[in-house]
Amino acid sequence: MSELAAALTAAMRTGGSDLVVFDRESAAWRRHRWPEVHGLAEGIAAWLLDRDRPAALGLVGEPTLEFVAAIVGAWLAGAGVSILPGPVRGAEGRRWADTTLTRFAGIGVRTVLSHGSHLDALQALDPSRPDEMVVEDLAVAANTGRRCPEPPAPHANPAILQGTAGSTGTPKTAALSPDAVLANLRGLNARLGVTPADVGCSWLPLYHDMGLSFLLASALGGMSLWLAPTSAFTASPFRWLAWLSESRATITAAPNFAYNLVGKYARRVSGVDLGALRVAINGGEPVDCAGFERFTTAMAPFGFDAGAATPSYGLAEATCAVSVPAPGTGLRFADVSDETGTRRHAVLGAPIPGTEIRISPRHDAPDGIGEIEIRGASMMDGYLGHAPIDHQNWFPTGDLGFFSDDGLVVCGRAKELITLAGRNIFPTEIETVAAQVPGVREGAVVALGTGENSARPGLIIAAEFAGRDRAGARAEVIQRVASVCGVVPSDVIFMAPGSLPRTSSGKLRRLDVRRSLEAVD
């Protein structure tokens, strides 16, 4: 048994806390003791060992008691885990199922567990599914009533096969060892000061590194976790606040867009008490300082402590968390100035224990800014199908940033940097300004440089638009960007809501946007 499996076993068997799962059909919370979850995990492990212990178990579906148990059960059996998302709204079921099983087969997964409509769609592919692919009912595998036999000998399988974002390129699969996963969970819990008295609340998808880490850190820390499916949040985002209030959650996490949404429409909020929250992690995408500050201010009348605001930095290649401020720090800013003015960036704290960060100078980055490089115990062994990495070497993240007196500051992606008239501009600065125009959808704007190696480089802004006056909005976007950012867009292209391509975790696929625009030209 790996140290990761042993640590989770010790925490789950002895803990007095609960896993509380939201059931969408009844709109009710179902409470389960962690020892009960571990008992089902043992059943999953026995089921897998009966089948010669596959190298990795594939999981698909919304979070249930059995789904959570299957993650731990795979590790009890010495197997790895890969979790893939269900179909997005409007997807054709058979095509989604075929793509999902093909993705699993491509990373060596031959055993898949699922439930509900996801299971039906995956099993309907038989006999056209990939060779030797087995798709079974998750509930049947979990409820065998059996205990895991004597722990198998340790082996070299990764604990997690985690897809990377792929927002600026082709997605890859990070192979994470049990030791790396455990180091990251311990480092995160140490930074946050997690105790069994804490209560977590999350609707983050478990196929995303932040959602999976939140779940595992809760189990390892012995705290209760209220876990809702992402679809329940999407259907009614303000439920999140009601869940936080009902659970008396002390820790939660969400991507930036969720905080922006709640802050923007705070007038809809009533009857909630957020006074128990001591940590509200903002991660998974760039932090909009104004939007996060608006959230903290708007939620103050409901008991939210501004010190709970926790903007953080992480990536799948490091399991998840890289830098996180200490609880109580709150939202702090660092200014970046040039000839066009000063822009604020969120300070994302210090490296978690076991992780190191350095800034490597780059000739194409603005003065004082370099590429963020990391190393430490949480690092992946490498990308699946690629050469392994040396954990003693520094890993280039592709992100640009610097250290302020208060911690790490991330300015943007190196690949996304736009060069115009001798200036280097981060697209997030332009996108934030453009999103302030009425009708432009927040979090649905992409700024791209064009012809940067030609005599006439330009700037194109593509945005989802839900207003009526396109011409007026287009003119206002150009005027605002020119005034605030000091560059004049060559073109502003409005698109229908939901049409910009995104990754499975909701990040905009900038490379795909660029390709689409180039194809139109």
From Swiss-Prot:
The answer, when asked if Ligase is one of the entry's keywords, is: yes
Disulphide-bonded residues? none
Record-listed E.C. numbers: 6.2.1.20, 6.2.1.47
> What's the protein here called?
Medium/long-chain-fatty-acid--[acyl-carrier-protein] ligase MbtM
Output the PROSITE patterns linked to this UniProt entry: AMP_BINDING (PS00455)
Q: Where is this region: Disordered?
A: 146-172
Known pathway: Siderophore biosynthesis; mycobactin biosynthesis
Q: Which GO terms describe its cellular component?
A: plasma membrane
InterPro entries given for it?
AMP-bd_C_sf, AMP-binding_CS, AMP-dep_synth/lig_dom, ANL_N_sf
Q: Which reaction does it catalyse?
A: a long-chain fatty acid + holo-[ACP] + ATP = a long-chain fatty acyl-[ACP] + AMP + diphosphate; a medium-chain fatty acid + holo-[ACP] + ATP = a medium-chain fatty acyl-[ACP] + AMP + diphosphate
What is this protein's function?
A: Activates lipidic moieties required for mycobactin biosynthesis. Converts medium- to long-chain aliphatic fatty acids into acyl adenylate, which is further transferred on to the phosphopantetheine arm of the carrier protein MbtL.
Q: Which domain of life is it from?
A: Bacteria
Its Gene Ontology biological processes? fatty acid biosynthetic process
User: Which keywords appear in this protein's UniProt record, sorted alphabetically?
Assistant: ATP-binding, Ligase, Nucleotide-binding
Q: What class of enzyme is it?
A: ligase
**One term of GO molecular function:** adenylyltransferase activity
Please report which protein family the annotation says this sequence is part of. Answer: Belongs to the ATP-dependent AMP-binding enzyme family.
Residues in the signal sequence: none
